[in-house]
């Protein structure tokens, strides 16, 4: 963990697992437009995601690419992980502030212009963590899995 990371945020995003995260706040773009792009890269290898985002036509691809690159650099600097071994374990977009502006209209009326922003969060972890997590999910006892299926039938 670096000196500038908030321990509570790291605990919420990663727990005690190795990895790193990056957050871009107040990105001047609608959260729904950013979510379209972030859904493409969630679960991908980090290097492949950065390469793919360079060729995406959406405007949201550029800030998301920068956040992924920042998370990779954070993992290399603070955790000593290699960029080739990282994958995007979590990626989500939250709504930021909404600036309200006024557009004058006919007959003295006015309408609102909403200038939305977003907070982009990306968490990268080593690929071994993904394989360990898959084994933990599939390693459920057979008796417990069987009893759940009988309840539903």
UniProtKB/Swiss-Prot annotation:
PROSITE patterns to which the protein is assigned, alphabetical: RIBOSOMAL_L22
Keywords: Ribonucleoprotein, Ribosomal protein, RNA-binding, rRNA-binding
InterPro entries the record matches: Ribosomal_uL22, Ribosomal_uL22_bac/chlpt-type, Ribosomal_uL22_bac/org-type, Ribosomal_uL22_CS, Ribosomal_uL22_sf
Biological processes, Gene Ontology terms: translation
Domain of life: Bacteria
Chain segments carrying region Disordered: 125-153
Presence of the UniProt keyword Disulfide bond in the record: no
GO cellular component, as recorded: cytosolic large ribosomal subunit
GO molecular function: rRNA binding; structural constituent of ribosome
Function (record text): This protein binds specifically to 23S rRNA; its binding is stimulated by other ribosomal proteins, e.g. L4, L17, and L20. It is important during the early stages of 50S assembly. It makes multiple contacts with different domains of the 23S rRNA in the assembled 50S subunit and ribosome.
Similarity comment: family membership: Belongs to the universal ribosomal protein uL22 family.
Subunit structure of this chain's protein: Part of the 50S ribosomal subunit.
Protein's recorded name: Large ribosomal subunit protein uL22
Gene it is expressed from: rplV
């Amino acid at each position: 963990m670096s000196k500038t990371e908030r321990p509570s945020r790291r605990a919420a995003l990663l727990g005690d697992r190795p990895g790193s995260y990056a957050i871009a706040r107040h990105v001047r773009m609608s959260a729904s437009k950013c979510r379209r792009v972030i859904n493409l890269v969630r679960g991908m290898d980090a290097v492949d995601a950065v390469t793919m985002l360079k060729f995406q036509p959406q405007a949201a691809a550029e800030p998301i690419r920068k956040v992924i690159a920042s998370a990779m650099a954070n993992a290399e600097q603070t955790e000593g992980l290699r960029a080739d071994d990282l994958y995007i374990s979590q990626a989500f977009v939250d709504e930021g502030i909404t600036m309200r502006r006024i557009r004058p209209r006919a007959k003295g009326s006015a309408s609102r212009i909403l200038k939305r922003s977003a907070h982009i969060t990306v968490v990268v972890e080593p690929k071994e963590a993904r394989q360990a997590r898959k084994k933990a999910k599939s390693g459920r006892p057979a008796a417990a899995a069987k009893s759940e299926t009988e309840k539903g039938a």
